[in-house]
């Protein structure tokens, strides 16, 4: 009788790469990185479509006769905007004669501002000031700052006030023979005796606690006053020094100018200019005192509920060719902590006309149609990978990827897999399966004559004396690795929290240290991924070994007395007693009875909100659905034949 030895053969050559894991190793024909690097998309986006609002002008106004050609946003996004063609927040605050006066108001955790161009050098608004850019800069900066701390905001276009009897509303030639709606100009007639200057003005205004349905915890008020170059310019009529001062209810000065105690500019001009400072005032009653002849009275404000911290995005608002723009919006956002600025790289070129419907701006704002996982000064990301090639510039919010080099991301085995600790087998693409018995048999059986001396390859066994790793030792190993991961996270969190405490009140320090902190977070995450990779490799290896043990048991049971298992994974068969069809029955049963495969593990990593720019106390914030408890062998289902 001719006896032959049939074994499960190790099929590893130079094309395989070795992957070491906790509890077992693998050879693989391919490998892939656990995550690919993502690249942010330029422009604006939002984290949640249900919690944002926008303020705009004709470029976002659905009622514009040229819409949608006039728009820089989609029709869907335009519905989120509070817009009117020709409008701007500053125009509504001051109300220059002949300009659009729109009631801007709305609520949202994330506020996007795409307006401002309608008050620019091109509009040539005068009213005692040739250049309003500095005032616009301070106004926009104050709006962004307060909006980032509020859920709701609203223009208050009519403050309650009390005006002295001797003062009447005035006009100015350099203001289209009219004047601003805010502040309003009140004057005293001193004719026919011009040397009589009139009486000091005393007026009152009230900032409400509520305007319509909008709660007001803080108001943005323009404190405006005239600036005279010398006492003589104001004092042509012998009227003393100029002053215009705002007091709170306790008599404390909160704004204005008093040339009785402050010097004049010393310049040689004959015409005063008007200055407006932006004050943040609580609701209440305020008084205004001014020198005779002129009174500038606050009659409007923007009110904010100050209920929650939120996100602010400011979009560069400039004209197309032929019109002069300013860059107050850009400068205001860049000088406001937490404000994200969207800027063009090319001149504005409109579709509807030179100033409406720019393709580059449409691309930059197209992200507003979607929800992003991360928004930052560098752009927005909606992919789930935790890594990006370059550091994302702050401010940034959401689940933002960390900067990492591609070569630093751990690789996991792919393609054909063969465990090295006591067995050999194959598996197709682990992204669709981990292992299955039908993968283990096809192409792996070979027949060898006993005399050739080809021995079997050790197969993992349930017994301590077997060639594999026991469940008990693997469980202990995984438990230790799990504890190590928790220690790594805890120590990293503690270090970052200490940094947070040091820099929580210093925005510049935050910016200086952010890169260093992010590098630490990235290194810690990469360290965790290395541990998780090793767990996965060991888990798959041990699982394959266990599955082969089950396969060997099934083969032995099918063979009965026809084959004798002489070593783990090897059997002696009498070729005269068990012919080819008999051997096929014993060793190739999977061809007629395929076994279901095991579902793949979920290896997704999820970065939580950035702790430095979202006001969060989180440190190294990563979560993963890979439960360490689920990685131990006792928690893994092994394919078994019936």
Curated annotation (Swiss-Prot):
Q: Where are the transmembrane segments?
A: 618-638
An annotated GO BP: virion attachment to host cell
Q: What is its EC number?
A: 3.1.1.53
Specify where the region named Esterase domain-2 lies, as residue ranges: 297-351
Catalytic activity, reaction form = N-acetyl-9-O-acetylneuraminate + H2O = N-acetylneuraminate + acetate + H(+); N-acetyl-4-O-acetylneuraminate + H2O = N-acetylneuraminate + acetate + H(+)
Keyword Transmembrane helix set for record? yes
Q: Family per UniProt?
A: Belongs to the influenza viruses hemagglutinin family.
- Return the protein name: Hemagglutinin-esterase-fusion glycoprotein
Read off the lineage from the record: Viruses, Riboviria, Orthornavirae, Negarnaviricota, Polyploviricotina
* The encoding gene: HE
